[in-house]
């Protein structure tokens, strides 16, 4: 069975107030052509179809038009599962209509049983070619309720186990049901998931150069009015909303080793889990933060048979929009902007830039770079200044102004570091930050509401 594995489209995303409709439209057209080109019999979308739970009409129209366009191809199966950015209810709402078109949607596990998560995949002639255990993003409470609503799990377990044990049990249960459905047929069994797995292979190597030196970078909120609303929830601007609880650090042993492939979503970089070629993240086809600007984007073409190692081809997604992140002192930033302008004159492309002042004296980047930014073929969306530069600020007024550089997430990290008496970039601080940042953001949001 040959299929395309993709995830984390985040349709409707407006990173730093950028309208990305044309960019996402170009990707969907390209994806359809790639599906036809590789002869994919199925498409698996592993969560985060949309960027928010209430996506715009434009985003929803793009999604449904794309699904409809696949009816004209030989891709006879589409599997869509919900992610943490999605509304499971919204995804599930048209399931009856989509099901008739062999487009299977599992927005959430609410009001479902184990059997409802098992989907048989068929070719254009109606012959079975595989089975998919379609598991969406699950919050801890949803998983607990899932088993409380069931008389018992397939193996007789109960809902009193830990959340990580319940997740492992659910994957075991759906796999066991898939085995029963397969019978004596020789067809592969795959699964989906939208979660944060531990021990990601390749991710650190891919992004280490990109993120080097960025840990001390903070937001210059005084430069662009209203920008804070568009800043990512994570301190490193990768657009991934943290998963709180035990489901936020899933071990590879959670997935039955007999599964022929596990298609994951949530991480925006193409990665293997624990160096296991059968358990992979496709990554997002789009840049979700300026620190991702230089990372290539992929979809995965997977060819899998029962009991064999899958053949996986990384297909690079062409860029429809260019993102650049430049760092250095003022003169370095000026030169990089001049070079970029020359490149865009020779080869025009819609381009957005993030500037990081990481050395030299504290200056207003608005004033210092006005000549290099005004009337050019690119748009600078953000100015930032590193903490190292801010530490050199001498005057009281500049010190007061420098506090505006920090986001609420930065202050939360500093609070954790103070309580732990650790450096704010230490592993201990990072672990606590990752564990509680979503709860912190939720509390801040509710405080603003009430």
Where would I find each of the regions flagged by the language model?
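Active-site environment of divalent metal-dependent phosphoester hydrolases
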Residues: 12-13, 51-54, 81-92, 111-115, ...
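N-terminal active-site segment of His-dependent metallophosphoesterases
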Residues: 1-68, 75
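Divalent metal-coordination and catalytic microenvironments
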Residues: 8, 28, 48, 63, ...
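Active-site neighborhood of phospho(di)ester-bond hydrolases with catalytic His/Asp-centered motifs
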Residues: 6-7, 43-47, 77-84, 104-109, ...
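Conserved beta-sheet core of the metallophosphoesterase superfamily
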Residues: 199-308
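Accessory, non-catalytic peripheral segments of nucleic-acid enzymes
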Residues: 37, 304-450
């Amino acid at each position: 069975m040959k299929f395309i594995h993709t995830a984390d489209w985040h349709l409707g995303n407006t990173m730093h107030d950028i309208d990305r409709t044309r960019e996402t439209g170009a990707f969907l057209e390209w994806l359809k052509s790639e599906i036809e080109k590789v002869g994919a019999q199925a498409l698996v979308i592993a969560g985060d179809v949309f960027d928010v739970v209430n996506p715009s009409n434009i985003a929803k129209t793009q999604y449904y038009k794309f699904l409809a366009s696949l009816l004209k191809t030989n891709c006879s199966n589409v599997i869509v599962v919900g992610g943490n950015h999605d509304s499971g209810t919204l995804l599930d709402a048209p399931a009856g209509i989509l099901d008739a078109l062999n487009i299977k949607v599992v927005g959430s596990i609410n009001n479902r049983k184990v059997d409802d998560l098992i989907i048989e995949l068929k070719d254009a002639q109606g012959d079975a070619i595989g089975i998919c255990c379609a598991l969406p993003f699950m919050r801890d409470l949803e998983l607990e309720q899932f088993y409380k609503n069931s008389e018992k799990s397939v193996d007789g377990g109960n809902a009193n186990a830990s959340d990580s044990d319940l997740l492992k049990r659910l994957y075991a249960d759906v796999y066991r049901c898939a085995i029963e459905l397969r019978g004596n047929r020789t067809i592969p069994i795959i699964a989906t998931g939208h979660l944060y797995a531990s021990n990601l292979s390749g991710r650190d190597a891919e992004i280490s150069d990109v993120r080097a030196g960025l840990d001390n970078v903070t937001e210059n909120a005084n430069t662009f009015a209203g920008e804070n609303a568009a800043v990512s929830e994570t301190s490193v601007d990768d657009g991934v909303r943290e998963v709180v609880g035990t489901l936020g650090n899933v071990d590879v042993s959670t997935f039955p080793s007999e599964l022929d492939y596990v298609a994951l979503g949530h991480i925006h970089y193409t990665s293997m889990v624990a160096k296991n070629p059968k358990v992979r993240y496709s990554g997002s086809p789009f840049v979700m933060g300026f620190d991702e600007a230089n990372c290539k984007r992929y979809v995965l073409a997977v060819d899998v048979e029962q009991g064999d190692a899958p053949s996986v081809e990384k297909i690079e997604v062409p860029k429809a929009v260019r993102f650049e992140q430049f760092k250095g002192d003022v003169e370095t930033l000026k030169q990089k902007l001049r070079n970029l302008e020359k490149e865009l004159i020779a080869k025009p492309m819609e381009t957005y830039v993030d500037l990081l002042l990481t050395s030299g004296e504290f200056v207003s980047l608005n004033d210092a770079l006005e000549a290099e930014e005004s009337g050019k073929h690119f748009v600078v969306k953000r100015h930032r200044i590193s903490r190292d530069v801010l530490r050199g600020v001498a005057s009281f007024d500049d010190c007061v102004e420098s506090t505006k550089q920090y986001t609420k997430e930065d202050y939360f990290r500093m609070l954790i570091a103070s309580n732990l008496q650790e450096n704010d970039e230490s592993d201990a601080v990072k672990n606590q930050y990752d564990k509680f940042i979503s709860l912190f953001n939720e509390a801040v949001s509710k405080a603003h509401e009430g």
